Amino acid sequence: MKRTIQETPGPSSTTVPPPKKLNSQRNGSNLEPGSIYFTPIGGISVPRQESESSRSLDEILADIRPINSLHFSFMLDFEFLIGSYPPSLREYPITLVVGAPDAPDLLKCTKNQKLVTVVGASLPIPFGTHHTKMSILEDEDGRFHVIVSTANLVPDDWEFKTQQFYYNFGVKIASGTVPRSDFQDDLLEYLSMYRNQLDTWKQLLQKVDFSQISDRLIFSTPGYHTDPPTQRPGHPRLFRILSEKFPFDASYEHTERCTFVAQCSSIGSLGSAPINWFRGQFLQSLEGANPSPKQKPAKMYLVFPSVEDVRTSCQGYAGGCSVPYRNSVHARQKWLQGNMCKWRSNAKRRTNAVPHCKTYVKYDKKVAIWQLLTSANLSKAAWGEVSFNKSKNVEQLMIRSWEMGVLITDPSRFNIPFDYPLVPYSATDEPFVTDKKHEKPDILGCIWTPP
């Protein structure tokens, strides 16, 4: 499948009120540092029909006014991206990072752009993808703006879906010592995984002060990782950072079962039983240094659109292209349906916009404790699977894909996209799958026939 171009589907039918304007912050833009925003509904092929706290790509770029840009994406439509820049800023350097198989097509699209550099990220394990969605933008005043997103750089992802992005920034230090920060360390460690392909950006970011940022980057990089667990990416990295943020508390009373919610747009093969991975090593990483007692095991739910959720969405069944779960996979893990909940976002007025965002949240005594916004879906390919390599006599973590997310532990900055309490699937609900025919007409009068 070509991943560098994506056509824009039909019009949206969602109607929501106009956005609230934020005051300009000390970062020189209208974006609040440390905040999570939604992308708009409409605004490209149809009139914009806003939801609160949303920003379009052209608004972001007009606010920041980058003179040097680094974009990571899975799918990338260059004409859409460059068209989102203000005309006066289209002749500045842009570096684009995609999966190595997609780099040749992108090079063809940008062959007349002298200041555009294309980087192809290595995908050493079959079926892996370069799934990271992140932008680092340098402005003329020496600020470096970091955006961690769930949206690909294609029109449909920025118009008809429930997407989110996280924003923050740092300031270049002209001379003297740059204060050390975990956020900067995270960023530089991730860029190092591209070997020497992004060394120029590493050198720039080494001179940037990110010390005001308390949030942490949670990322995955492909490969067979045999280094110590504390140095591994994927879900072991989440375990380590959660353990640092929330050390073991022997005095804590488990009066209720804590709840973990995963919300994603695709699901991988998780095994024939939940203990294989879902409630095994993945849940153990979500719990960090504070595992639930055996008498009160953690509850774990998955928010994923049902057939009816997609059928009644603003794009109808076409919106289901962004939630590519397959019936052939679901048939092997029917146990998962008992954990599934419908997509509901009435509080944010986005129930009718199919979710492409990915969110992981811990609730304790019905209160959200942390939120993770990420590109990583619920899959071993994204988060990794620990196994023992008998031939090498070593434990290894196998990850197929590149992923990027940000962990926020400050409740005042949470922006959880789904409603809580959750709405479980009914006895007649089924998850939307792309390889099964759906004959009941959708909101646009169409049926779904598998491609």
Curated annotation (Swiss-Prot):
Its EC number is 3.1.4.-. Substrate binds at residues 133, 358. It comes from the Eukaryota. The keyword Lipoprotein does not apply. One of its GO terms (cellular component) is nucleus. It is found in: Nucleus. GO terms for molecular function: 3'-tyrosyl-DNA phosphodiesterase activity; double-stranded DNA binding; exonuclease activity; single-stranded DNA binding. It is an enzyme of class 3 (hydrolase). The keyword Ribosomal protein does not apply. The active site is at 131 (nucleophile), 356 (proton donor/acceptor). Residues 266-269 are annotated as: Interaction with DNA. The record marks 379 as: Interaction with DNA. Its main location: nucleus. Residues 22-32 have a biased composition (Polar residues). Residues 1-34 are annotated as: Disordered. Keywords: DNA damage, DNA repair, Exonuclease, Hydrolase, Nuclease, Nucleus, Repeat. One of its GO terms (biological process) is DNA repair. PANTHER family: TYROSYL-DNA PHOSPHODIESTERASE 1 (PTHR12415:SF0). DNA repair enzyme that can remove a variety of covalent adducts from DNA through hydrolysis of a 3'-phosphodiester bond, giving rise to DNA with a free 3' phosphate. Catalyzes the hydrolysis of dead-end complexes between DNA and the topoisomerase I active site tyrosine residue. Hydrolyzes 3'-phosphoglycolates on protruding 3' ends on DNA double-strand breaks due to DNA damage by radiation and free radicals. Acts on blunt-ended double-strand DNA breaks and on single-stranded DNA. Belongs to the tyrosyl-DNA phosphodiesterase family. This is Probable tyrosyl-DNA phosphodiesterase. It comes from Caenorhabditis elegans. The lineage of its organism: Eukaryota, Metazoa, Ecdysozoa, Nematoda, Chromadorea.
